[in-house]
Swiss-Prot record:
Catalytic activity: tRNA(Tyr) + L-tyrosine + ATP = L-tyrosyl-tRNA(Tyr) + AMP + diphosphate + H(+)
Protein's organism: Leuconostoc mesenteroides subsp. mesenteroides (strain ATCC 8293 / DSM 20343 / BCRC 11652 / CCM 1803 / JCM 6124 / NCDO 523 / NBRC 100496 / NCIMB 8023 / NCTC 12954 / NRRL B-1118 / 37Y)
Protein name: Tyrosine--tRNA ligase
One Gene Ontology biological process: tyrosyl-tRNA aminoacylation
EC number in record: 6.1.1.1
Subcellular location: Cytoplasm
Protein keywords: Aminoacyl-tRNA synthetase, ATP-binding, Cytoplasm, Ligase, Nucleotide-binding, Protein biosynthesis, RNA-binding
HAMAP family in the cross-refs: Tyr_tRNA_synth_type1
Annotated positions binding L-tyrosine: 34, 164, 168
GO cellular component terms, A-Z: cytosol
Amino acid sequence: MNFIEDLKWRGALNQVTDEAGLIEAMASGEIGAYVGTDPTADSLHLGHLIPFMVLKRFQNAGGKAVIIIGGATGAIGDPRPTTERQLLSPEQLRQNEKGITEQVTKLFGDEKTAIVNNNDWLGKLTLTDFLRDYGKLFSINVMLKKDVVASRLETGISFTEFTYQILQGIDYHELWRRHNVQLQIGGSDQWGNITSGIDLIHSIEGNNATAFGLTIPLMTDSSGKKFGKSEGNAIWLNPEKTSPYTFYQFWYNQSDEDVVKYLKYFTFLGVDEINNLEQEAKNNPGGRIAQKRLAQEVTKFVHGEQAVADAEKLSAALFSGDVANLSAADIADAFGGVPSFDITSEKKNVVDFLVDGEVEKSKRQAREDVTNGAITISGEKVTDVNFEIDPTKHYDGEFVLVRRGKKKYFLGKVK
């Protein structure tokens, strides 16, 4: 399969301006494709991974991957369908640019990759030059019809955000000129901005200039929810914001209805292997064989093989209940979302500990659960109601992990 056929099979193609022309251009020699991202945060998240997966496939097909960090456009903000974006300070933008650049470098490597900042050319563009060289090439009537602009006309859109599509068009032309970029990749909501860039290239370079646009379908799960969040929280690519274990678990916990779609889109596995995993999922529903492979592949791509090994080691320990030898970092990682309570480092009777931490509603219930073997403290079952808990001896003196019954966890945090 060629690049386009592969995208179609993977469900990763929404629109393309000239399919035959793009295939011909890719076959004729190395061309570049680009994805742009504005540094609105200090880390990429799963939403960014959607266009980056297509760009990585383009790179694997022999093309050059170009990533724009929007140092200039990030100071303005791509228009939202409903409200104006909050502007960031120059200092915050620079910090965000640094974090995103490090992540992109890890994903794409150094070969056949260019990471550029549009502040290098937009930052030097005077208002007079902008109006004379570019403004005259854009029709207000056409710009008003772009979906994201049209949706804001009633509620109001600033001139700043209105001109964003011109700046994105300038980006495409600059990359066309500097890096032989002939393809822009974006989400389905970027179609208007992408075609504006193609029109600008044709206006400046002539209608024979080869420039293409490709958009990706909106990614949703089987229930129709927008992909990329876990219980309302963004899944970040920065391991300090979303740990590799949490990242791994996000993929492992995908439903049987979604897993094949995500295997196609977010991994580089071939047709036969994915078809085999799909068949295994059908033959053994709930077995999570396909989910495990999905989690392994995506975690390896983003965080590396060691992160996969560490995540699976932690998962195995949690599944078996053998948590006594985990590190404090592992405990914070795996149990950060369970009910928690503050404790001191001083010793305390287990019954008082359970009641004070609201693990148990009464001392009577606490004594009963301890006596019946329903209470486990940091991996060790406690059956003596006179047992004293010494927080300094648990997980580097940072946590005490309580399990009531088989699955109900609570975390005491030393303050």
